[in-house]
């Protein structure tokens, strides 16, 4: 199987990294399919990876007056009894900031890395315009959420039975199988219809490396 990021995202990706194989150092590689696969996808089959959410954090390196921020800005809310930070929303790029008194900020909702960076810097600029001695520091991508449709059904019960050391599956509580990848450290939500959600990735390379490791495993548990 071959994978690629959605074109609109790939064109804006700074790194544009390709997948690399780490089978020798990957504990998942030792788990082989128990039986041969009857149906094998063509090698040129393409699967589009879609970025759904980027979470980034940064610091403005100063203490913030949250009441003043809320009263002097639009598209913000502050209810300290419910949440101890200011929630500020931005329309372009579409993202949300969680702003804390310590100067720590969480930016979430961006659809790619560039939007996360631009949105974070715009939020810092807004705080600077309010008179705070802002320094944009410690910017870091914390979580990339992505999805892919493998376009084949998966036998989740069998997968959980063989890979129980990495997975948990309780269909009465949640319809997907939770698979905890060790290298790279990513959590996958795998559904019977072949849809997969990736959470916890730090880069696109993490997602591609994860797919490199997990796709042969999932293909071996394909429903026939």
From Swiss-Prot:
Family of this protein: Belongs to the TBP family.
Main location per the UniProt record: nucleus
Classification via InterPro entries: TBP, TBP_CS, TBP_dom_sf, TBP_eukaryotic
CDD domains, per the entry: TBP_eukaryotes (cd04516)
Lipoprotein in keyword set: no
Record region (Disordered): 14-34
Compartments it resides in: Nucleus
PROSITE patterns, sorted: TFIID (PS00351)
Name used for this protein in its record: TBP-related factor
Gene3D superfamilies, alphabetized: TATA-Binding Protein
Molecular-function GO terms, alphabetical: DNA binding; general transcription initiation factor activity; RNA polymerase II cis-regulatory region sequence-specific DNA binding; RNA polymerase III general transcription initiation factor binding; RNA polymerase III type 2 promoter sequence-specific DNA binding; TFIIA-class transcription factor complex binding; TFIIB-class transcription factor binding
Gene: Trf
Role summary: Acts as a transcription factor. Binds to the TATA box promoter element which lies close to the position of transcription initiation. May be essential for embryonic development.
UniProt cross-references to Pfam families, sorted A to Z: TBP
GO biological-process terms attached to the record: DNA-templated transcription initiation; embryo development ending in birth or egg hatching; transcription by RNA polymerase II; transcription by RNA polymerase III; transcription initiation at RNA polymerase II promoter; transcription initiation at RNA polymerase III promoter; tRNA transcription by RNA polymerase III
Cysteine-cysteine disulfides: none
Compositionally biased intervals (Low complexity): 17-34
UniProt KW keywords: DNA-binding, Nucleus, Repeat, Transcription, Transcription regulation
Sequence repeats: 51-127, 141-218
Assigned GO CC terms: nucleus; polytene chromosome; transcription factor TFIID complex; transcription regulator complex
Signal peptide bounds: none
Superkingdom of the organism of origin: Eukaryota
Tissues with expression: Primary spermatocytes in the adult testis and in a subset of cells in the dorsal medial region of the embryonic CNS.
Organism: Drosophila melanogaster (Fruit fly)
């Amino acid at each position: 199987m071959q994978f690629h990021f959605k074109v609109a995202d790939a064109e804006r990706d700074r790194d544009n990294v390709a997948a690399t194989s780490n089978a020798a150092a990957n504990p998942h590689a030792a788990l082989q399919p128990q039986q041969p696969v009857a149906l094998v996808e063509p090698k040129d089959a393409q699967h589009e990876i879609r970025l759904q959410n980027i979470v980034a954090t940064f610091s403005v390196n100063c203490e913030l007056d949250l009441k003043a921020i809320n009263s002097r800005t639009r598209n913000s809310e502050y209810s300290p009894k419910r949440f101890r930070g200011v929630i500020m929303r931005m329309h372009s790029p579409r993202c949300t900031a969680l702003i804390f008194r310590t100067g720590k900020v969480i930016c979430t909702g961006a659809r790619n890395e560039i939007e996360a960076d631009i949105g974070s810097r715009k939020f810092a600029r807004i705080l600077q315009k309010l008179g705070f001695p802002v320094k944009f520091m410690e910017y870091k991508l914390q979580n990339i959420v992505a999805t892919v449709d493998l376009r084949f059904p998966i036998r989740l019960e069998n997968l959980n039975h063989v890979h129980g050391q990495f997975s948990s599956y309780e269909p009465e509580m949640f319809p997907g199988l939770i698979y905890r990848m060790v290298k790279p450290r990513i959590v996958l939500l795998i559904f019977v219809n072949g849809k997969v959600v990736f959470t916890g990735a730090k880069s696109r390379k993490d997602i591609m490396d994860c797919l490199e490791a997990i796709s042969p495993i999932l293909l071996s548990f394909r429903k026939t």
